[in-house]
């Protein structure tokens, strides 16, 4: 939505969702394991859903020889997955692969549900002067559900600039283009869902009762966001109307 001739408001929302079901049947005498010699049946139901929402305010303005652009935004990402598994072995009646054809003691049920949410605010400022000098500043702050409360907020900025020095030279057929650039950036990253907790889980769930066990993985309640820092310098030059050139980073 165009608020003014230089100010625009944009909202985007998208969803990615899929369902997957698979069924595996091992006929009698078709397995190596002795307990499966009278047949085995397994079914998996997987549901995945990813929701993304972005609200952006964009401003573009030209002031004398300067082109100025500002972007402010807010985003939300929500990821959910559900996996339901059930298995059974030792068919009562031969060649009839059905869970109704398996004793309760030989059935296994397992359910796993995962949810993760990430919310962020971000901004980008871009400025250029006479197609000669360019400057870009960015910053983003995220809040994640996968880290401890004290560490779930993290900020990461970046700065980049370039100088097109070929604009200072008169136009000629030999030297076509020359630019030097430099940038510094930080990128933040969270972790997987439930990585901070150690909990019991139900590896096998019988129809006649339930069972729980300790996980082989121990959670870390002191996890912090991962911050990656990078610095880049580069030189790009082209000659003979762009036919020959190089780009070094």
What are these model-predicted stretches?
Residues 32-33:
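N-terminal, polar/charged subdomain of small-to-medium soluble alpha/beta proteins
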Residues 1-26, 36-249:
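Extracellular/periplasmic, surface-exposed regions of secreted and cell-surface proteins
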Residues 29:
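Phosphate-binding loop and its immediate beta->loop->alpha context
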